[in-house]
Design a protein with these regions (language model features):
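Membrane-interface helix-cap regions at the ends of transmembrane helices
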Residues: 34-52, 102, 124-134, 180-206, ...
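Structural signature of hydrophobic alpha-helical transmembrane segments
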Residues: 1-4, 50-66, 104-121, 146, ...
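Juxtamembrane helix-loop-helix junctions in multi-pass membrane proteins
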Residues: 5-32, 154-181, 233-239
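Structural motif at transmembrane-helix junctions in multi-pass transporters
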Residues: 16-25, 72-88, 164-170, 223-246, ...
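Juxtamembrane helix-loop boundary signature in multi-pass membrane transporters
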Residues: 1, 95-150, 154-155, 160, ...
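Alpha-helical transmembrane segments of compact multi-pass small-molecule transporters, enriched
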Residues: 32-37, 88-102, 117-118, 177-182, ...
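Hydrophobic/aromatic residues within transmembrane alpha-helices
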Residues: 13, 76, 102-104, 108, ...
Length: 291
């Protein structure tokens, strides 16, 4: 649910502040928030320096991969509605199944495989254009989001492996370091640095308050998801997380009806049917996977 809220906040920020700017600037704000969290984690968990350099490098790589996935996701969100982008996160569990099978030894039952197939069908169905552009597949959207899901699955796998071997907050600390490194590299690019500083000067109060709230919501969802990885198989956690699509769709309808200035989704009869069918397919798939 927190991630669904964050998706709509991301869309609002993209529409209001980043329509003509590179969405990579939004990733800089994410990096800023996690860097500010580092000393707090270090204070409460002094053992963060205990892992070997090799372990630290791999955990930091998970953070870099996470930010790379976020960049693909934001580029997709810049040109599509939130409820159209979100279903593609459902491809994540399938990547998670494969990775967990080969790396962690997790196996899939026939029911889980059927559920995974329904999730994919739902994600693909919502990406089809109808009407004037009937049956035109949104290739760019699919490429961005499938790549995003694969990268996120690899990042989650690395996090789980080390969180089980080391410690949750220590692993989180070094993953945040990797996210901070990614943001630092972006900030070193002159064009991104200029856009970042310009946005801060022209929209300081609104941008910082909304973005900070969004990043805290996203951080809460991310930490909850990562902690769940310690309690359940990777594929199961990702499948349950795929319910984000249903919440995104529901919140999108509420916003369009009651708060259209904040976010607007297409509410034509066919669009509602298409998104509704996709949501049902995804929900059925999740139910089969988690049963």
């Amino acid at each position: 649910m927190l991630w669904a809220i964050s998706v709509h906040l991301d869309k609002y920020l993209v529409e209001r502040f980043f329509k003509d700017s590179d969405v990579a600037i939004m990733v800089l704000f994410t990096a800023l928030i996690v860097v500010l969290a580092l000393p707090i984690i270090w204070y409460f968990e002094p053992t963060v320096l205990n892992p070997s350099l090799g372990s630290i490098a791999l955990i930091a790589l998970a953070g870099i991969l996470y930010m790379t996935g976020m960049l693909f996701y934001l580029r997709a969100l810049q040109s599509e509605e939130a409820s159209v982008v979100a279903p593609f996160f459902q491809t994540g569990p399938l990547f998670g199944y494969v990775l967990a099978y080969f790396v962690l030894g997790e196996t899939l039952s026939p029911r889980q495989m059927l559920g995974g197939a329904l999730i994919i069908v739902g994600a693909l169905f919502v990406s089809l254009r109808f009407g004037r552009n009937m049956k035109t597949f949104k290739t760019r959207l699919a490429a961005l989001m499938v790549t995003c899901s694969l990268i996120m699955a690899v990042s989650s796998l690395i996090f789980k492996v080390f969180a089980l071997r080391v410690e949750f907050w220590t692993t989180t600390f070094w993953m945040f370091v990797g996210e901070g490194i990614f943001g630092t590299v972006l900030l070193m690019i002159p064009s991104y640095r200029r856009q970042f500083l310009t946005l801060l000067r022209t929209n300081t109060a609104a941008l910082l308050s909304i973005n900070a709230s969004n990043e805290l919501v996203n951080l809460g969802g991310g930490l909850g998801n990562r902690y769940a990885l310690l309690l359940a198989p990777l594929s199961l956690v990702q499948a349950i997380g795929s319910t984000t699509t249903l919440f995104v769709f529901a919140f999108g309808v509420v916003l369009s009806v009651f708060f259209p200035w904040f976010g607007r989704e297409t509410l034509s009869g066919w669009e509602l049917l298409q998104k509704g069918v996709a949501a049902v397919l995804v929900a059925t798939g999740v139910a089969l996977v988690t049963r």
